C-alpha cells in the first residue's frame, strides 16, 4: 500500500504503475542477462539480511524496495520494522529479509538505491518543512527531477511533508523568463495564457 499518496495530482494507480516500470528498468540495467557473481553461491543456499540506517533520516521508498526483491524472487520475505515517513535514527534496523541468498544478493543494490535516493529527498524536504513551521509558506517541488524518477521523487516530497507544484508540462502553466522572451513580452504571453484558460 502506498503511504501518503493521497495528493490529488498523484493517483495511487499511476504511482504503482510507475514503481513497477522504474523497478523493472533498474533491474534490467543492473542485472541484465544475469548476476554472474551471485551464481557462485549455491542455488539452494538461504540467507537472512537486515537493512540498517547509517544516519538519521525520513524513511521513504518501502514499496520500491519490496518491488525490487519481488521482481527478482517473489518468495523473498521482508518484514518492515518502520513505516513510510517515519523519522529513523542511525543504526536503527529498518527491515529483516529472508530467502534464497542468490535472490537477496541480486536485488539488494537496486533496492538500496531507491531507498537511499527517495529517503534523501524526503529527509531534505522534512528539514525545510520544519524550518518554515508556523509561517504561511509552503514547500513545493519542481520538475528538476532525476530522469525517469519524476513520480518517485515527487512522491518522496509529499512523504517529507511538502507539496507537488505540478507533475509535468501537461498539467499546469508556469511562465518563466524564456517563455516571455520567446513570446515577445509579458503582456503577449499573459494574453495567450488567459485565452488557454478560457478554453
Residue ranges and their predicted role:
Residues 2-199:
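Acidic/glycine-rich phosphate/pyrophosphate-binding loops and surrounding catalytic core
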